[in-house]
Regions:
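Active-site nucleotide-sugar/metal-binding loop of Leloir-type enzymes
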Residues: 69-82
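Short, flexible, basic/aromatic active-site loop/helix in glycosyltransferases
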Residues: 110-152, 165
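Short, well-formed alpha-helical segments that are part of the catalytic scaffolds
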Residues: 10-29, 42
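Conserved donor-nucleotide/metal-binding helix-loop-beta segment in metal-dependent transferases, i.e.
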Residues: 91-123
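C-terminal catalytic/acceptor-binding lobe
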Residues: 177, 181-256
Length: 256
């Protein structure tokens, strides 16, 4: 059976409307149901576009984690498995640039939980504010999980069962961003047959929103907007929260 899509989207300026319209026919072929939960600041136009196209779309609360939780909860209510979670802007980029890859990974699964990570090439498309801080978190998480090499635990893309999603919904959220790492660790530890797949389609999706600005300024100059001090502070805050989440699992392992 086709999976249920559980997804979240933050788009305050409705920049992705044309891409949503273009790519929805492809997504309709891949997913049995399409659920998208929006951040509280996402534009009303985006909500209207999604509903018009047949998505089950609604707003989440102000916290980032609550938006993810609502998407997973609505997916579990469908009583259909598996559930495929991917941030919606990433999914739009994936299906527009690597449609065959997306179709392949969504239509066949031999694991009760599949963690999707970025290939080395896909990871390097992101700005250093992201690659450098995430490398620290991924290295620590990979050691906690006993991987022989560092894996991209932060792709925030998973194929999972409803029972696993329900466990995430019940899990305690201890800080703002730690769930990005806490959840995949929990899913992997509590799965009987977990799998890991690296994909090209999870390359950096943000440029899709800013094609006009990129055309005017040039790609390298535009990308510098994500290398400023404000962005470094944001990414370091995320890293701090994720390290706290990892510490919880290290303490748990020691106690057992």
């Amino acid at each position: 059976m086709k999976p249920v899509l559980a997804s979240t989207l933050h788009d305050p300026q409705n920049r992705l409307e044309s891409l949503i319209n273009e790519q929805t026919p492809k997504l309709e072929e891949l997913f049995h149901e399409k659920i998208v939960t929006l951040s509280s600041s996402t534009s009303r136009e985006t909500l209207q576009t999604l509903k018009k196209l047949g998505y089950e779309a609604s707003y989440g609360d102000k916290s980032v984690a609550s938006t993810y939780i609502l998407a997973l909860r609505r997916a579990t209510e469908k009583k259909i498995e598996p559930i495929f979670y991917c941030d919606f802007d990433r999914l739009l980029h994936w299906t527009s640039h690597y449609p065959e890859e997306l179709e392949a990974v969504t239509q066949k699964s031999t694991h009760d939980f599949t963690l999707f990570g970025r290939t080395k090439r896909a990871m390097l498309t992101h700005p250093e504010t992201q690659t450098l801080t995430e490398t620290t978190a991924k290295t620590l998480a990979s050691k906690v999980l006993g991987f022989p090499e560092t894996r991209d635990v932060l792709g925030t893309t998973w194929m999972l069962k409803a029972q696993q999603a329900e466990a995430l919904i019940r899990a305690k959220i201890s800080n703002q961003y730690g769930f990005y790492l806490d959840w995949p660790i929990r899913l992997w530890i509590n799965s009987t047959n977990p799998g890991y797949i690296e994909v090209e389609g999870l390359e950096w999706e943000t440029p899709d929103r800013y094609q006009q600005e990129i055309t005017q300024a040039g790609y390298d100059a535009w990308k510098e907007n994500y290398q400023n001090m404000q962005e470094w502070k944001k990414r370091n805050l995320m890293l701090r929260d994720m390290i706290e989440a990892i510490a919880t699992h290290i303490q748990f392992n020691k106690s057992t």
